[in-house]
Structures are given as structure tokens and as C-alpha cells.
A protein has these predicted regions:
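Segments that shape or occlude catalytic/ligand-binding pockets
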Residues: 35-71
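Residue-level detector of functionally special positions within alpha-helical transmembrane segments
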Residues: 2, 46, 50, 78-79, ...
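A contiguous, low-structure linker/loop signature
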Residues: 64-126, 148
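Active-site loop segments of alpha/beta catalytic cores
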Residues: 1-36, 102, 108-110, 118-371
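Aromatic-residue-lined binding/catalytic grooves and analogous aromatic/hydrophobic interfacial grooves
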Residues: 57, 79, 256
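N-terminal capping/small domains of soluble enzymes
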Residues: 20-21, 33-38, 58, 84-90
Length: 371
């Protein structure tokens, strides 16, 4: 069974030949993996780890393939731009060094309250437009990957990226006290993404399997956005994303870290098909309960702890955890094996990453004792 058929089967709550697998990681982690496995290209790394999903933004979310940028030169987008949407919005990257090496973080905000205190000032900002891109070659870029892997089209956000624009504390305040400003910023980001990805789907929607929406709404112990704000700000916009994806028979993946147990029924109502990730270290997000309560209506990815097991456990610990998670989540389909945080960082030993996917290949075969 090829990867695309494997992924589509599991996302339709069917059992394929084995549990599909996917991963993202920082650039430094990817470099380390390639060196250890003796491969040079991203394609070869996918093959070496038996990964089934190719992300159009690449392993590190900085862009692998994308439409050609033809917008204003003064924005500073290079001619070889390949899908790093953070650059389009004006975020700047900060390099951080610690005991594990170097990593990067997004600088923020772009439209701070001091410079853009009202909607009138916000209207003067040069918001990105889908017309800044030439989508005519996007199909030819995706086709070579779609022959071998399921395709995840990522980069969309209706809440998290607006918090980067404004600063998370400021936008959370404005959700309550300055609703006009919050709505304006959220709609600017949402409208751009729906237009941008709508044009990609128009060109190559039949090649795409997953539309990934990244909108962190959970902290370690609970939601950090109120139910009323979920209803007002996220629900209508996530539904628009789901409607766009489903128009092209694409599954909508909703990424959020943290304890989001209370919001899962809402996500299903919004049209979400996949919750990413299951983060086992947080309360109320144990795989067994989630599978039992929502597994007939929702698929899952993640589940292998990226806070404890992967960075601090032994290879044997990782293998045992992978087997445990597969035994719980794999029956009946609806599960993609992945870390409990989708982007692995430098604190995770290379041997543990390799062990995770080797164990997935070994224990994830159907039919299994757990089915």
C-alpha cells in the first residue's frame, strides 16, 4: 500500500496495512538525523524513517515548495521563496543558543499597539495579498512528492498567527476589551489564508490530503481562551477552513498543543477531522479516553511524549511507549504516529527519534493483537 492510500484509509476510520507516520523538526535536528542515517535529501530522510506524509513547508516549516512570489520588492521576499509564510507577514526570526545548540523563534509583534493602536491605523499596514503570488507552477512542484507520499498543505492559522502579529497578551486583551480591533486582525489573516490556500487547492487540490490549521488554544492545564471567545472568534473561521478543505475532499487537521479536552466537541462541530497532537503529559488528554469518546468522529496524531519520553527516556522506553500508544489508538484506523509535539527540538536524542519510527514500523502492522 502506498503512503497516500495508507493515510487516506486511516483518516476515513479504516485500517490500512500499517499505522502511517509523520514528523516535523527543527533544522538542526534534521541535519543531525541525516548525518546519522547517511542521507542527504529530505526525500531520502522520509524514506529512511518510513514517513508517510510530506509537508509542503518542509520538515522545519520554513518552506519546501510554494507559489512564486511576485509581490512588492520592498517586502524583501527573495526570488527563491518557497512557502515560508512568516516572511510574508513580516515576522522576523531570532536565533537562540542554549545547551542543546541553536534554535529559532519568531520575533513579535509586527503591528504592535504603540504603532497601530486603532483599526484606522491597522488599515494602513501592508497586509499580504494572494495576488502577490503566482500559483501556476504549484502543481508541478507537488506532483513528484504526491507520487510517493500523502501531502499536507500547511501554514494556515486563524488565531495563532494573529497573536504573532499583535503579541499574544495584547490580542487576548483585545478579544475582550477591543473586539473591533481583534476581529479586524483575525479577519485580515483568515481572509488572506483562505484566498492563498484556495488558489493552491484550485491548482492541485486533487493531490493534497491534509490541510493543516495551526492555532494553539491550550496551555499545559487548560484552555487559555474562553469558551465564549472560541465561539465568537474561532468557530466561524475554522468552519470556513473546513468548508474549503472538504470542497476538495481534503481532511482538516487542527493543531493545538496543551489540554484542549473541553474544546474537542466544538472542534468536531467546526468540521475538524484530525486533532494534532495528543500531548500525553497534560491532564485530560490520555489517549485511551480520547479514543473511546471521540475516535468514531475524529482522527488523531501524536501521542508519543515529547516532554518526557522522547527527550529523557531510553531507546527501550521509547519503543515501549510507541507500542502502548499504537495499541490504544490504532484499532479501527484514525491514527497517525507522531510525537506529542509535532516539531522535535534539539533536546531529543537522535537515537530516540529513530527508535520511535522503527517501533512504529514494527508494532503498527494490521491486523494486530489490539484489533
Amino acid at each position: 500500500m502506498i503512503s497516500r492510500d495508507r493515510v487516506r484509509a486511516t483518516l476515513n476510520q479504516q485500517e490500512p496495512d500499517r499505522v502511517p507516520m509523520m514528523m516535523s523538526a527543527s533544522g538542526w535536528v534534521i541535519k543531525r538525523l541525516k548525518q546519522r542515517l547517511g542521507v542527504e535529501t529530505d526525500r531520502d530522510l522520509h524514506r529512511a524513517l518510513h514517513l508517510d506524509v510530506f509537508d509542503t513547508r518542509g520538515f522545519d516549516y520554513k518552506g519546501a515548495i510554494g507559489p512564486k512570489y511576485i509581490g512588492p520588492e520592498e517586502i524583501g521576499i527573495p526570488s527563491d521563496w518557497r512557502g515560508d509564510l512568516f516572511k510574508v507577514f513580516g515576522y522576523h526570526e531570532e536565533i537562540i543558543e542554549n545547551a542543546y545548540g541553536k534554535s529559532s523563534a519568531m520575533g513579535m509583534p509586527c503591528v504592535g499597539v504603540d504603532e497601530y493602536p486603532t483599526v484606522a491605523e491597522l488599515e494602513t499596514y501592508r497586509w499580504p495579498q494572494a495576488d502577490w503570488f503566482d500559483f501556476s507552477e504549484i502543481r508541478s512542484q507537488i506532483e513528484p512528492w504526491a507520487d510517493e507520499f500523502a501531502i499536507a498543505c500547511t501554514g494556515c492559522s486563524v488565531f495563532q498567527h494573529p497573536t504573532l502579529y499583535r503579541g499574544i497578551e495584547q490580542l487576548l486583551l483585545e478579544l475582550h476589551a477591543e473586539r473591533e480591533i481583534a476581529t479586524f486582525i483575525i479577519d485580515k489573516v483568515t481572509d488572506f489564508y483562505l484566498d492563498y490556500f484556495g488558489r493552491i487547492f484550485e491548482e492541485a487540490g486533487d493531490l493534497i490530503d491534509i490541510f493543516r490549521l495551526a492555532d494553539d488554544i491550550g496551555a499545559q492545564n487548560n484552555l487559555f481562551i474562553s469558551p465564549s471567545n472560541l465561539d465568537e472568534y474561532l468557530a466561524p473561521r475554522v468552519r470556513r477552513c473546513a468548508d474549503l478543505a472538504h470542497r476538495y475532499d481534503i481532511k482538516l487537521l487542527f493543531h493545538t498543543d496543551g489540554n484542549v479536552r473541553k474544546a474537542i466537541p466544538d472542534m468536531i462541530e467546526w468540521g475538524v477531522d484530525i486533532l494534532d497532537p495528543i500531548q500525553p503529559e497534560v491532564p485530560d488528554m490520555d489517549a485511551e479516553t480520547l479514543k473511546r469518546e471521540f475516535g468514531d468522529r475524529l482522527s488523531f496524531s501524536g501521542g508519543v511524549g515529547a516532554q518526557e519520553i522522547l527527550p529523557r527516556g531510553s531507546v527501550e522506553d521509547v519503543r515501549a511507549e510507541v507500542q502502548r500508544v499504537i495499541d490504544i489508538l490504532a484499532p479501527g484506523g484514525g491514527y497517525i504516529l507522531a510525537p506529542g509535539h509535532p516539531s522535535l527540538q534539539m533536546d531529543v536524542p537522535t537515537e530516540n527519534i529513530i527508535a520511535m519510527f522503527e517501533a512504529g514500523l514494527e508494532y503498527g502492522r494490521y491486523p494486530s493483537d489490539c484489533t
